[in-house]
C-alpha cells in the first residue's frame, strides 16, 4: 500500500513498480574508481560566452596609450554595455584584453595576486612591463598546451626605465612587440590607420597618440558590428597609469542612406 501511494505521488518516479522486480542500473566503473577513468584534457573554455572585441595600443614619446570599448557581447547580442576590458597592473604597467571576458576576469585575479605577493617583500622592486609580458607568454602557452587555453588576446603597455613598452600576446602564446597594436577586428580596420600615421611620423606626442586612437575607435564603431561607442582610454607615463572613461566619440551618420549592398 505504501509503495502504491508513493508511486502515485511521484516519490518513486522511474523506480520500482508495485509487484515487480526492480533492476538497479549499473554504475560506470569510472564513477566508482576515478583512477580508472580515461585521462582527457579539461576543456572548460572552448566555448566563450561573453566576449569583447578590439583593443588598440600606440606608443608615444614618453608612454603608451591603450583603448578598448566597454561592450560585452553575448554571441551577437550587445548584452553588457558597461564592462571594463582594461586593467592597471601596477604603477608602470597596464593591460587590455579582447576575447572571453570570464577568462580576462580570471587573469585579473591572478595578476593582482602576483603584484600583491611581490609588494609584500618590501624591497622596492616591482614587475616591469616586459616582465609581465614575458610571464603572460609562458602562462598562455602553458594553458594552450593543456588544451584549455585562456581565450584572450592581450595588449600590454608600460613605461619603465625611460622606455615605452607595447607588447602583444594571444591565446596560443604568440608574442611580439610593435609601435602600434590592434586585436580582433581592429587588426584589419584600425591597424592600417595606425601604421599609416606612424610611417609618416614615427614619434608621436601624447596628444597626437590620443587623437589617433580616438579616431580609430570611431572607425571601429562605424564598421565593426561588435563594437560600441562607449570606451576607455588608458595612458601610462612616468607619472603612472591613468584610465579615463567611459568616453564617446562624435559620430556622423549623414551618409548612411547612400551606403547600399549590405542589407
Swiss-Prot record:
Taxonomic lineage: Eukaryota, Metazoa, Chordata, Craniata, Vertebrata
PROSITE patterns, per the entry: PROTEASOME_BETA_1 (PS00854), PROTEASOME_BETA_2 (PS51476)
Assembly: The 26S proteasome consists of a 20S proteasome core and two 19S regulatory subunits. The 20S proteasome core is a barrel-shaped complex made of 28 subunits that are arranged in four stacked rings. The two outer rings are each formed by seven alpha subunits, and the two inner rings are formed by seven beta subunits. The proteolytic activity is exerted by three beta-subunits PSMB5, PSMB6 and PSMB7. Forms a ternary complex with SMAD1 and OAZ1 before PSMB4 is incorporated into the 20S proteasome. Interacts with PRPF19.
Keyword terms of this UniProt record: Acetylation, Cytoplasm, Nucleus, Phosphoprotein, Proteasome
Main function: Non-catalytic component of the 20S core proteasome complex involved in the proteolytic degradation of most intracellular proteins. This complex plays numerous essential roles within the cell by associating with different regulatory particles. Associated with two 19S regulatory particles, forms the 26S proteasome and thus participates in the ATP-dependent degradation of ubiquitinated proteins.
GO CC aspect terms: ciliary basal body; cytoplasm; cytosol; nucleus; proteasome complex; proteasome core complex; proteasome core complex, beta-subunit complex
Record family assignment: Belongs to the peptidase T1B family.
Positions of modified residues (Phosphoserine): 26
Gene behind the chain: Psmb4
Annotated positions of the N-acetylmethionine modification: 1
Source organism of the structure: Rattus norvegicus (Rat)
SUPFAM superfamilies: N-terminal nucleophile aminohydrolases (Ntn hydrolases)
Protein name in UniProt: Proteasome subunit beta type-4
Amino acid at each position: 500500500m505504501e509503495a502504491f501511494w508513493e508511486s502515485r505521488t511521484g516519490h518513486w518516479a522511474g523506480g520500482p513498480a508495485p509487484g515487480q522486480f526492480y533492476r538497479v542500473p549499473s554504475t560506470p566503473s569510472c564513477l566508482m574508481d576515478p583512477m580508472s577513468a580515461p585521462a582527457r584534457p579539461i576543456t572548460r573554455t572552448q566555448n566563450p560566452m561573453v566576449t569583447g572585441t578590439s583593443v588598440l595600443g600606440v606608443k608615444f614619446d614618453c608612454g603608451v596609450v591603450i583603448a578598448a570599448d566597454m561592450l560585452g557581447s553575448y554571441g551577437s547580442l550587445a548584452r553588457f554595455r558597461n564592462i571594463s576590458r582594461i586593467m592597471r597592473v601596477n604603477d608602470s604597467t597596464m593591460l587590455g584584453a579582447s576575447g572571453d571576458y570570464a577568462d580576462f576576469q580570471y587573469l585579473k585575479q591572478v595578476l593582482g595576486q602576483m603584484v600583491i605577493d611581490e609588494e609584500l617583500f618590501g624591497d622596492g622592486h616591482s614587475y616591469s612591463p616586459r616582465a609581465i609580458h614575458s610571464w603572460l607568454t609562458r602562462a598562455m602557452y602553458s594553458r594552450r598546451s593543456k588544451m584549455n587555453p585562456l581565450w584572450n588576446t592581450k595588449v600590454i603597455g608600460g613605461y619603465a626605465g625611460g622606455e615605452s613598452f607595447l607588447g602583444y600576446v594571444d591565446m596560443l602564446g604568440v608574442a611580439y612587440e610593435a609601435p602600434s597594436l590592434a586585436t580582433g577586428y581592429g587588426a584589419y580596420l584600425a591597424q592600417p590607420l595606425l601604421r599609416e600615421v606612424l610611417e609618416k611620423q614615427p614619434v608621436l606626442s601624447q596628444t597626437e597618440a590620443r587623437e589617433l586612437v580616438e579616431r580609430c575607435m570611431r572607425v571601429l564603431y562605424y564598421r565593426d558590428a561588435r563594437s560600441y561607442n562607449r570606451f576607455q582610454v588608458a595612458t601610462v607615463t612616468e607619472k603612472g597609469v591613468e584610465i579615463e572613461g567611459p568616453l564617446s566619440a562624435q559620430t556622423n551618420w549623414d551618409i548612411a542612406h547612400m551606403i547600399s549592398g549590405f542589407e
